[in-house]
A protein has these predicted regions:
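RecA-like P-loop NTPase motor core
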Residues: 381-384, 399-457
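Glycine-rich phosphate-binding loops of NTPases
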Residues: 58-239, 243-246, 431
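Flexible phosphate/Mg2+-sensing switch loops adjacent to catalytic phosphate-binding sites
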Residues: 48-85, 337-347, 379-388, 415-418, ...
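Conserved H-loop
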Residues: 389, 395-397
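The Walker A (P-loop) glycine that initiates the GxxxxGKT/S ATP-binding motif of P-loop NTPases
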Residues: 29-30, 317, 356, 396
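Extended helical coiled-coil dimerization/tether regions that scaffold
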Residues: 199, 207, 211-354, 375, ...
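Conserved hydrophobic alpha-helix in the ABC-type ATPase nucleotide-binding domain
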Residues: 368-369, 373
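Pre-Walker A-like glycine/lysine-rich segment at the N-terminus of P-loop NTPase domains
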Residues: 1-48, 55-76
Length: 457
């Protein structure tokens, strides 16, 4: 099973867009401020948090005027102010009230012996249907329409109106989830975010990976990944993983015992000094110390990655940024795979966002990045639980875009109304199959790619 498309409404530049996803890799291309980060962020908000929250500023710009006009429309009618809105009025106004919405279309194989975590989302009665919709919406809580609209609000001053609206959105808006029959949009079933997260695991490799400045607190991101590996491996039920964890804990216990023995001996030497101050006195017990070591804290706080070089271990920050970037991406993928294998049986969806993987990579490495990513994924998938992640990669690299071809590229454009338009090159060039090779060559313009060849100079 896999996600075939995502529809997003009213989130920042993504006022009303649909993004088709490939089964394996989709590449997002576009200028700065074209909505690429907004895509990642709305997925992170809904599927990466236990309790999604949004602010007025997260709504698309055109929503501000919709809010204002709706308040004008309701408050202009004095009868509505004096009498609470009934159920039919709530339905009428709710349809016009802006809400941030994410719709995921899932495609599945109907011949599967069981649908696992997908089962609650399949609500149609059509034996030939192999799709279902999952809708997650951040909107006005049901039953709160009177409190949201009928309390006093200043419509004369737009600044004061926005300030009050911001408070009301925070107070009265909430997240709802439901499954929807793609053949009958009125057929719905309310579910929870917990149901969605059982089905879909979402992970992110952010653009800012803390590699650039050795003076920052983020100077050893590779070492910090070890803590994540330990946490994930600890939850694994596989015998090999449990054996590894036990060996780590045994090693730490051995060190802990040795330290405690040394501390006890040194403590005895302090007793004469303490006795001068009357300790321990009558009715006062003596004391002893015990050192307790935590494997997790040792890995996160006291473990550092070094690179052997001519007998000297160089710290992590001494390696090139491009190399560290690749290592970090690969280690994070391995961590995501371990988490997926621990929590799932291979019947779930794994969506992984990678932002700007080209950072610090030379053109040749950018050109082969997608291919290497696929090979690394295949290698990890062969280690146990079936694993077919869906990658969404946002990039400014023409080399990465050129390597994947039109089928995988979605181009983000911002129009004059400050809205994002998504150009699906797979669809746009579907009528030009015979000329696709020529068009691809025409759009490929590279120069000086030989400069970084190892033996050129």
């Amino acid at each position: 099973m896999n996600i075939t498309s995502t529809k997003i409404k009213n989130f920042r530049l993504l006022s009303d867009v649909e993004l088709a996803l490939e089964k394996e890799t989709t590449v997002i291309v576009g200028r700065n401020n074209s909505g690429k980060t907004s895509l990642t962020e709305v997925i992170r908000r809904f599927l990466g948090n236990d309790s999604p929250s949004f602010q007025l500023e997260d709504f698309s710009i055109n929503c501000y005027e919709k809010f204002f006009k709706l308040f004008q429309r309701i408050l202009a009618d004095e009868e509505k102010i004096e009498a609470p809105l009934d159920e039919s009025s709530e339905i009428e106004f709710r349809d016009d009230l802006p809400a941030i919405e994410l719709c995921l279309t899932i495609e599945y194989d109907k011949s599967l012996p069981n649908f696992g975590a997908l089962s609650p989302f399949i609500i149609d009665l059509n034996d030939d249907c192999t799709k279902t919709n999952i809708i997650i919406r951040y909107g006005l809580e049901y039953g709160k329409i009177n409190e949201f609209f009928l309390n006093e609000i200043d419509l004369e001053n737009k600044i004061l109106f926005s300030q009050e609206l911001k408070k009301r959105i925070s107070k009265f808006f909430t997240t709802k989830v439901w499954a929807q029959d793609p053949n009958d949009l009125s057929n719905k079933k309310e579910l929870t975010l917990k149901d969605v997260k059982k089905l879909i695991q979402v992970d992110f490799i952010n653009a800012q990976r803390g590699l650039d400045d050795v003076t920052t607190k983020e100077s050893n991101p590779l070492a910090r990944l070890l803590e994540g590996f330990f946490d994930t491996t600890s939850m694994s039920k596989e015998a090999q993983d449990q054996s590894t964890i036990q060996k780590l804990e045994d090693a730490v216990t051995s060190v802990q015992t040795s330290i405690n023995q040394g501390f006890s001996e040194q403590l005895k030497d302090l007793f004469p000094s303490l006795k001068k101050f009357g300790y321990p006195g009558l009715g006062t017990q003596s004391f002893q110390t015990e050192v307790i070591l935590d494997v997790k804290k040792l890995l996160s706080n006291f473990t550092h990655v070094y690179y052997p070089n001519s007998g000297v271990n160089l710290p992590e920050s001494y390696n090139g940024l491009g190399t560290r970037n690749l290592i970090l991406i690969l280690l994070q993928l391995a961590k995501f795979h371990k988490e997926y294998s621990t929590k799932n049986d291979g019947m779930n969806i794994h969506l992984i966002f990678i932002e700007e993987p080209e950072a610090h990579l030379h053109p040749q490495m950018q050109e082969v990045f997608i291919k290497q990513l696929e090979e690394a994924t295949e290698m990890l998938a062969n280690t146990g639980t079936p694993w077919i992640p869906q990658f969404v990669i946002s990039t400014h690299s023409s080399h990465i875009s050129n390597a994947v071809g039109f089928k995988h590229i979605r181009y983000f454009l911002q129009n004059n109304q400050q809205k994002t338009i998504i150009k699906d090159l797979k669809k746009d060039f579907s009528d030009y199959d015979n000329n696709k090779t020529f068009i691809h060559k025409y759009m490929t313009l590279t120069k000086s790619d030989l400069f970084l060849l190892t033996k050129l100079f």
